[in-house]
């Protein structure tokens, strides 16, 4: 992973090029240094105790329109997005192998070890109209951490690459249903009339994609916990800083600390 300006962190582990075909959408955020060293097990244990409101607010914190909505509006939108993800997962065969589902959808799935020529860590990526890439080095590192840190009891035994692929399948679904699916059709007015500019809320697709992946793979926790786990495989300090940022939402009464 390329470290830039001390502590810049890739804050969304799934790549998605629906917004601009052929280009990676890499969102970076300046992170504070972690306050203290923490074990990966303790961080995972705490993250698993957080309720959906924390994860929805975390997703919103990455959205360019975050400052235009109240907390209540963000949570309401988050609930609707999660419901959208669940509903779309229900339309597919639950419990089926996600790789078989991808094949039935006519997708071209490639599994290189790392991105070619990229300086940032990308874990998975969808390129319109039908190409998905899962970068296996990051999945391998995460699986090794699960084994070495004895996290199976917390995270289960679902392969990390399956969860990555499932999330990208939602973005494929978004593309194919862009005229009807909630995460694509819901827009907000940014300018007052007569100068109209209606914009999509990007984080809704990420919230829905996480819930879609959870339902489709049957994992017992939100895939959002993999943000910290997979970053830990490359940079322990950056992962700990990200954990503390997420935990702060719960500390502000925006979730339960457990």
Regions found by a protein language model. Give the residues of each.
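A metal-dependent hydrolase signature that marks the N-terminal structural subdomain at the beginning
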Residues: 1-137, 141-143, 148-150
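Generic structural hydrophobic/aromatic packing signal, biased to beta-strands
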Residues: 109, 134, 165-170, 226
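Conserved binding/catalytic microenvironments
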Residues: 127-145, 156, 177-183, 187-188, ...
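Secondary-structure junction/capping motif
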Residues: 70, 95-97, 156, 160, ...
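Short pre-active-site segment immediately N-terminal to the catalytic Zn-binding motif
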Residues: 142-164
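Metalloprotease/metallohydrolase-associated module, dominated by Zn2+-dependent proteases
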Residues: 185-258
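Alpha-helix initiation and capping sites
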Residues: 92, 126-128, 155-159, 163, ...
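Active-site recognition of the HExxH zinc-binding catalytic motif
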Residues: 163-180
């Amino acid at each position: 992973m390329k470290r830039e300006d001390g502590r810049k962190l890739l804050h969304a582990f799934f790549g998605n090029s629906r917004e601009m075909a052929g280009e990676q959408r890499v969102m970076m955020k300046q992170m504070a240094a972690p306050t203290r060293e923490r074990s990966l097990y303790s961080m995972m244990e705490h993250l698993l105790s957080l309720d959906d409101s924390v994860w929805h607010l975390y997703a919103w914190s990455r959205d360019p329109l975050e400052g235009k909505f109240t907390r209540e509006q963000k949570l309401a939108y988050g609930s609707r997005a999660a419901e959208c993800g669940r509903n779309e997962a229900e339309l597919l065969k639950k419990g089926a192998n996600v790789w078989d589902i991808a094949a039935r959808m006519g997708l071209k799935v490639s599994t290189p070890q790392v991105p070619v020529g990229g300086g940032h860590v990308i874990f998975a990526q969808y390129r319109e109209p039908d190409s998905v890439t899962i970068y296996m080095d990051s999945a391998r590192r995460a699986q090794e951490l699960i084994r070495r840190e004895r996290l199976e009891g917390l995270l289960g035994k679902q392969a990390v690459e399956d969860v990555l692929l499932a999330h990208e399948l939602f973005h494929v679904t978004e593309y194919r249903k862009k005229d009807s699916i909630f995460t694509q059709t819901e827009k907000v007015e940014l300018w007052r009339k007569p100068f109209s500019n209606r914009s999509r809320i990007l984080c809704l697709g990420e919230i829905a994609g996480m819930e879609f992946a959870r339902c489709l793979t049957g994992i017992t926790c939100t895939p959002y916990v993999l943000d910290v786990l997979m970053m830990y495989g490359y940079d322990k300090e950056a992962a700990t800083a990200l954990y503390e940022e997420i935990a702060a939402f719960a500390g502000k009464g925006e979730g339960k600390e457990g």
